[in-house]
Amino acid sequence: MSNVNTLSALAKSGALSGKRVFIRADLNVPFDDAGRISEDTRIRASVPGIRLALDAGAAVMVTSHLGRPKEGALTEADSLAPVAQRLSELLGMQVRLVPDWVDGVSVEPGEVVLLENCRGNVGEKKDDEGLSRKMAALCDVYVNDAFGTAHRAEATTHGIARFAPVACAGPLLEAELEALGRALHDPKRSLVAIVGGSKVSTKLSILQSLADKVDQLVVGGGIANTFMLAAGLPIGKSLAEPEQVEQARAVIEIMKRRGAEVPIPTDVVCAKSFGADAAATVKAAADVAEDDMILDIGPQTAQRLADILKAAGTIVWNGPVGVFEFDQFAHGTEVVARAIADSAGFSIAGGGDTLAAIAKYGIADQTGYISTGGGAFLEFLEGKALPAVAVLQARAA
């Protein structure tokens, strides 16, 4: 999978000494109402790549997008200034913020500068060739260390990589590609995928793509309700998409023909209303009443999934199986999370809700790999080529 040049290999060979290195990181972090960084995982994740280049004697430029500013019109709220400050603390050295950097940056070997929000540059999102060439002229080596934006062809993720003298993957991107390759290109069997979420329509292409590859396709959340409808089960007033039932049936059929299966819940946790104080009732799947809402899988189904997961060779996890924000509907997701933690198989997890579940149950250390990319992770699961990765592969060929 990872047939790309890597920053680690260049650093090892001594090729970075005295060179100008341009790192595209993903520093798109959330802020609280007071304008302070509320969660800095992405900034911390960027440090190893920056250190690698620094220690190899390079002059280092780092940039990232932050939010969705209007091109050519950055406001104070769009500035990477707080990120520069946090990066300075993490690196133990001053990281200067450079505005208006496209036409030239002064940076010395052993120094790190942060180039202001790249989405402020006119032409960034359209992958403009003129802008890409200007940015490529700033460096000797371009490094992409931002898996979270790998599915977007933009000037700092794609265009610059076409024209920079050398283009490579940073350690974060390298690890991500390796883990994803291990999970989908050459997986240890059995391969189990968990796809949760509210809508079949938004994840249909992923479900179809996985139906050709996996041994067990576990569906959760609103998606599972649509699959229950497809299996002829009552779902009351649960969230579902009746218009997607045919597509769900087709996925079940593809799996069946391959001797694989979509385990349909045999029991569920219902409530008459949706909320933190809703009373939870466990019912057999066939007994769901017209005014019931299914908000979690039942204990019998959860145990069956746990058995499947514990025996798995590889697990791909995207999405919870119930409304785990409310404790009375969290049991299914907790059982699944703990089974993944206890499984001897290799697990890879991605997507915002999934990361929240991993944090809630404290199983980060027992998850094989936690993907930093939301949309990029999903597009990879769909089997789509990621433009930022494809260009690095082309440059390495």
From Swiss-Prot:
Keywords attached to this entry: ATP-binding, Cytoplasm, Glycolysis, Kinase, Nucleotide-binding, Transferase
GO BP: any one term: gluconeogenesis
EC number from the UniProt entry: 2.7.2.3
SUPFAM superfamilies linked: Phosphoglycerate kinase
Xref: HAMAP family: Phosphoglyc_kinase
Assigned protein family: Belongs to the phosphoglycerate kinase family.
Subunit structure comment from the entry: Monomer.
Name of the protein in question: Phosphoglycerate kinase
Gene that produces this protein: pgk
